[in-house]
Structure formats: C-alpha cells, structure tokens
C-alpha cells in the first residue's frame, strides 16, 4: 500500500508540472507509473479528466491487460494499450504521452521517422558520443486502437524510448518517472529547436519533407 501511495504522489506531481507547460490541452494525453512488477500493476490517468485539476479520481490502478484492479466507475485512458505494451515488454517504470504543437508539427514534416543530431541535450537520452544522431519513429494515428497498439509495439526496443503518432502526440517511456520526464523534456526541446531552425532557414525545403 505504501508503494501505491508513493507512486500516486509521484505521478500526481508529474501531472502538475506537465500541466503548467500546457502539454495536456483539452483533456488530451495520458501518463502512467508502474506500481508492482509481479503481478504487473500500474496507475494511469482516468479518461476524459481535466488534468489542470487535482482530484482523488485522477488515476486508477490497472493490471497487465489495462483492466481496473478494483471496482470503479472510472475508465482508463483510451490509449492504455500503448502503456500495457511497454510495461509487458520492458522494465520501464513510467510512460508519458502528451500532445504539443511542436510534436504534432514534426509528424507533418516527416513520414516514417525524424532524424535529429548534433545537439548537446541528446545526452539526456543517455547518448554520449559527439555529434550524436537520433531517430524517432512516426506511426499513423489509427482510429482502431488495437491496430494502433500493434504498430506501436513494433517500435518498443528497450526500457526507454519514444514514438511519435501522426497528429497525436508523443509517447515517451523511461526506467522511472525522473528518466521518463527528462527524456520527454529533451525531445520537446529538440522539436522546438528544429522547427525554429527550419523557419529561420526558409522552411521545409531546407531540411524536411512536408508530409500531409
């Protein structure tokens, strides 16, 4: 029970911080944190909640299938399947899915992936070589959630990572809440920088292919 309360508090603090950045517009986005490994349980945001508010109904505890552990009228977020795929296939401890203008714009500039390089903040992703390059996959935003989940699952390759969904934000996961939030902040910085650089250079013709 102590672990449940500890993780609830941790996830609530992350929600508050990301809310101040306006990364949950119009109730969008979902976040989760692992509570136990065996059996697998995790807290995840309830569907349709205003994340600028803090209430006792912000999160619910679900199992490895994303099914609520306790009887509740709350529904887990629509994209819970993405979280279950991550937790069932890695040792990740926290998953953050947010919609920002920048990460949506990026998915309209590129088709299958975006490549970013030679930025100091890439070290926040535990990549230390000079002039490092990263590739972030972009998948289509299927309305059929099982199809979306299956396409997403193909890009889960470790205890930390990120996948962009076209016009549907980014999902980032990490070893724990600190790691996941750090990675999310790094990706969002990189997206913002990249878009600003393209605008200064004269648009997508200098560095990206418009995809729409």
Curated annotation (Swiss-Prot):
Zn(2+) binds at residues 97, 99. Its EC number is 4.2.1.109. Its cofactor is Zn(2+). InterPro entries: Aldolase_II/adducin_N, Aldolase_II/adducin_N_sf, MethylthioRu-1-P_deHdtase_MtnB. SMART domains: Aldolase_II. It comes from the Bacteria. Belongs to the aldolase class II family. MtnB subfamily. Catalyzes the dehydration of methylthioribulose-1-phosphate (MTRu-1-P) into 2,3-diketo-5-methylthiopentyl-1-phosphate (DK-MTP-1-P). This is Methylthioribulose-1-phosphate dehydratase. It comes from Bacillus cereus (strain ATCC 10987 / NRS 248).
